[in-house]
Each structure stands twice: as structure tokens, then as C-alpha cells.
Amino acid sequence: MKLRSSAITQGVQRSPNRAMLRAVGFEDDDFNKPIIGIANGYSTITPCNIGLNDLAKQAEKAIKDWDGMPQMFGTITVSDGISMGTEGMKYSLVSREVIADSIETACNAQSMDGVLAIGGCDKNMPGAMLAMARMNIPGIFVYGGTIKPGKLNGEDLTVVSAFEAVGQLTSGKITKEKLIEVEKHCIPGAGSCGGMFTANTMSAAIEAMGLSLPHSSTMAAEDQEKIKSTQKSAEVLIKAIKENIRPLDLLTKQAFENAISVVMAVGGSTNAVLHLLAIAHSSGVELSLDEFEKIRQRVPVLCDLKPSGKYVTVDLHKAGGIPQVMKILLEAGLINENCRTIENKTIKEMLLDVPAEPPSDQDVIRPFDSPVYKKGHLAILKGNLATEGSVAKISGIKEPILTGPAKVFESEEDCLKAILTEQIHSGDVVVIRNEGPVGGPGMREMLAPTSAIVGQGLGEKVALITDGRFSGGTYGLVVGHVAPEAAVGGNIALIQDGDSITVDAIQKLIQVNIEEAELKRRRSLWVKPKPKYNSGVLGKYATLVSSSSKGAVTDQNC
């Protein structure tokens, strides 16, 4: 087997290259071993990533034990939970591209033979997957693990509990002292946010596509099994290099369909739609919003998980994790059994010893004939407000239909102020625009407004639509990723206060109820907004980024 790294290790002309490698610990025999990058997302910025360095060191040792040469390098992270509701959140989706670009750059510049990527916070997972697909060298993803639930008076808490408590405080439902108690107890240690929010959703999707080990996506960050799984991941990667198993061998159209099915079954985040579209783009796989809707129609929500449900991800792990969910779907004919994994097994082989039915002593994972919801919770809506499409999350509500007057805001901050001063009422359709990939730029998540609405008891009585995104912690009648976005002239830019808007997840419709002639009149008066940034990261991003309906990628025109 000829190693890619031979480009820097073999031949007399590579003596200077070897000299550099000797300075970082290479010996004579090491130049014939595979060089494996460890893309380490360690950071003290966020609890999601604070434990990653320990896992990276375990991976480093295991790679050496299996006769590989590890080379560790850092990737960035942005804490969505900390930047949420601020200008800093504009950098969150941007960080997905920075992570992908940094991994691709480091691995390709150093002619690495494989990569083991370790991540925790939301954009770490899709960022790593974009890089793996682009490079197509053997790779495996190690998830840093989920956080255990916080506890207060016997109740399980997550970070979303704190966001909702803000709304509860402003509506007089709790005291400031109770808010502080929630704040102090909702995040007890290391790990990614504990519900089926974006990080856990994307780790589940990666496991479903075969690029991480079975059960690894639901493990708690602080449990010993996470270390063992990391060590095993290093061993599996070495074997994949020897067998030349590459990401694009695994990232087939059927693998993406499997991932979408799992996302629906676990009640995952709307962000999975955006990220899977982007990963498919980097993989050369044709994937559209319409395919998410087709899968939603046949795949039920099987897991009762927060934000809209009862349990957290560690409970899912105890109940059998993603393999149990996949086995139920496999038995129902809803996932492809022939897709392969990084262990060079088919999905059918991987799930051979998993029971066909979930354990009877739990209700985290429901049997197929007794689901939480009969259809998936991520609906693709189209209409004159979203001709390219939009993504509605309809879990946690009894009636996913609302027609009401628009209350229009040009930014998240303006909207949140109106909510907290009780200017939003039952039946309203809240519109937050100019928060899209270009207009934000960066497509901020609207967790603060949606949580405040829920906290005030309006979660089933108010709809919120935006060209921005939603956190995985959001639930209620919310519609995001509206495309085309306002900044490029989408019809969401033409809505005025008081316009009647219909959101109907049953008919898959999102529309403003005015005459086409009036829309044309307003369009004739519309002026394209000036860019908010003319330089730097955000200026560059706004210039390059595609529509959210295409995954908000930055290399679409390459």
C-alpha cells in the first residue's frame, strides 16, 4: 500500500521534510507508517468542547499503539449557547466553513493519510464532515459526548430551561431568584447540550451514515465508555486506511436518506436539514429539500426527547441509542440495509445483534406502531413566502396551522424586545427578516425569541417565521430557512405589519394572503439593502454564501 504521506517522507529529495518531522518526534521506522491527523476542537470557550483534549490524547496514544503516526492540530469552535442573541451569533454558521477549511487545509498541506476529527459544539460535526467529503481520505469522527442533565427539585434541566426561564420571568410566572437557580443548575459539567438539539442531532446523523462508531453519538462526555470508544475509533481508522475505505464510499445517496430518517425518528434539529444539504454538496450527492419532505411523510418520530419531549440524550443511550432506533426503522423497511460503515460492515451486519423492538421497561424509544408522532416533525413548506422552500419544526404543538396578522421585525433584537414587553399576542405571526445567510450575515438562530414566547405560554398560539435559523432547542410553530431570503429580494422582504399570513404544516404551505398585483407593486418599490459588512470574515461570507435551500455553502460557484 502506497501511503499519501510518501510525498513528504520518501526519497532523497525529501530529506529536508524528514528533518522537520524528526524534530517533532519521528524516528527512522516512522516514515513508513501512516500519518494521521487529529483535528482537535478542544476549547475552554464552551462545556461542549472542554473535555476534547483528553479524548485527543487518548486517540494519539491509540494511533501510536496501532502503528500510526498521529499529528495533532487545532480547529476553532463557536459556542452557540454563549453567542446566542448577540451579534456574535452571526459567526456561528460561518464557523462551520472555517472548521471545514482548516481541517482540509491542514490535512492536505501535510499529505496526511487519514484524519480523526474530534468535536463537540454544533458546527464541529458538519464542519468535520464537509472536510472529510472534500478530501476523501480515510476519516472517522469522534463526538465529544453529550452533557448529563442538570437537576433542580427533581426536574431534568438543559440550557433551554434557562432561555425559557427568561420568558417566564418577564410574564411573572417565576421570580428572579428562581431564574438564577435554573441558571446555576441547568449545565452541570462537560458535554454538548443535553436534549436532541443540534449537536446531538448531527452526531446521530454521522453515526447513521457510518462515519462514527455505533452508540458513540449518545454517550455522556464524562463517562468512561467515551474514552474506550475514542480508542476504538483510532483502531478502526488504521484499518480503514489499510483497506482504503474512504468517506465517499460511505456517503452515498442512500446513506443520506438513512441519516434523514434517523433525524426524523429522534425528533432532531432543523439545522440537520441545512447541514445535510451542505455535506451532500461536498460529497457530490444530489439532495434537495423535497426529499426531506418525502421521508418525513413515511418516518414517524419514535423518541420522546427534549426540547419538546420528556427525556434527554443520555436516556436515549440507556434505551439502546441510535442502533436501536435504526433497527426499528430497518425492520419497517425505512432505511437501506446495504449502506456501509467505516468498520466495513453493512448496516444490516452492524445491527445484527440489536433487538427488533425497544426495551419494554422504558418509553424513551417507542415501538414503531406506537410513535410519539405518526409523521416526521421537520416539514418543508413552500408558497409565495418561500418559493425555494422553508423548514418548519412542528413538534410539541397540537395544531400546526395558523393564520394571523404579521408583526414584522428587521432583527432578532427588535423582536425579543417586543416579546419581553408583551407586545406579541395569541394569534400573531412574528416575522424576523434580514437574518439569512447573506442578510445577517450568518443566519443567526432565534432561540432567545422562541424560548421567550414559550416561556410566556404562547408556544402553541404564535407562529414565528424567519430567513434565519432556529436552535435545536427550539420548538413550537416555527418556520426557518425561508428562501429566497429578504436580503436577495425574497417575498419575505415585502411583508408589512398586519398582512395576513398562513402557516399550514398539513398542506405544507406558507403564504402571505394578499393579491399578486400588490406583491408586484411592493416589489417595484423594494430597494436591495446595502451589505452590513464590507470586509473581514462576515463580509467575505456574505459575498460567497449560497441560499439556505442549497445548504448555505460557500463553494457553490467553484
From Swiss-Prot:
It holds the Pfam family ILV_EDD_C. One of its GO terms (molecular function) is dihydroxy-acid dehydratase activity. It comes from the Bacteria. Mg(2+) binds at D80, D122, K123, E445. Its cofactor is [2Fe-2S] cluster; Mg(2+). Pathway: Amino-acid biosynthesis; L-isoleucine biosynthesis; L-isoleucine from 2-oxobutanoate: step 3/4; Amino-acid biosynthesis; L-valine biosynthesis; L-valine from pyruvate: step 3/4. Binds 1 [2Fe-2S] cluster per subunit. This cluster acts as a Lewis acid cofactor. The active site is at S471. [2Fe-2S] cluster binds at C48, C121, C193. Keywords: 2Fe-2S, Amino-acid biosynthesis, Branched-chain amino acid biosynthesis, Iron, Iron-sulfur, Lyase, Magnesium, Metal-binding. GO terms for biological process: isoleucine biosynthetic process; L-valine biosynthetic process. Signal peptide: none annotated. InterPro entries: DHAD_IlvD/Edd (IPR050165), Dihydro-acid_dehy_C (IPR042096), DihydroxyA_deHydtase (IPR004404), DiOHA_6PGluconate_deHydtase_CS (IPR020558), ILV_EDD_C (IPR056740), ILV_EDD_N (IPR000581), IlvD/EDD_N (IPR037237). The keyword Coiled coil does not apply. Homodimer. Functions in the biosynthesis of branched-chain amino acids. Catalyzes the dehydration of (2R,3R)-2,3-dihydroxy-3-methylpentanoate (2,3-dihydroxy-3-methylvalerate) into 2-oxo-3-methylpentanoate (2-oxo-3-methylvalerate) and of (2R)-2,3-dihydroxy-3-methylbutanoate (2,3-dihydroxyisovalerate) into 2-oxo-3-methylbutanoate (2-oxoisovalerate), the penultimate precursor to L-isoleucine and L-valine, respectively. Belongs to the IlvD/Edd family. NCBIfam families: ilvD, PRK00911.1. This is Dihydroxy-acid dehydratase.
